[in-house]
Amino acid sequence: MPRIVATIVTLAFFSSTFGQNPAINELDVLLEDIDTMSATVLQLIIESDGGVLEESEIQMHLKKPDGFYWETIDPFPELIVTDGTYLWNYQPDLEQVVIEHWDNSESELAAQLLNGQTGNIAEEYMVQLSSDDESSEFELTPIDENSVYEQITISFIASNLDMIHLDNKNGEQTVWHFQNLEKNHLLADSLFVFEPPEGIDVIDNATN
């Protein structure tokens, strides 16, 4: 499963079951307001020595409950899109698309956040909030010592998603910075269904 989908499909509302945690309550308020979202995403993958391994420009669209579109524009074109049933991974340079069944239950934390599947957050993470009049920053620290993450940070400015920062235990960091963000606008369902262009190879693992 592509790393980005395993890490970013879910940030929209929280279950009221966790109302006793003020930090989760506040995150709930911010995420609950998102029904659709579009943004330009600047992605940085940073090595343990601080060097930038990769910098990418991405266009993303999100539509609850299951629609997710993630197109890498530069440097290596790639499209990942799901309607909640199937996932298409289209690589123009290879002239191929791989089709898989999509299972949200197998997605990682950020994916679960973006589509509201947050039932295990309070059980698996310590959540702390730092905020002022303009911004809110949530630090999620895994309770399980075997987690691949050291910490996950989610930042908002003026109630809009600004950044997700994944700090892995191997020292690698992934940063998504959201720009030109638009939310709760009309997005067609057809945006989240990929129609393969003629002449490309189709690897359909969903029917195998």
What is each stretch, according to the model?
Residues 59-109, 171-174:
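An acidic-aromatic
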Residues 26, 31-84:
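N-terminal mature ectodomain segment of secretory-pathway/periplasmic proteins
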Residues 2-10:
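Sec-dependent signal peptide recognition
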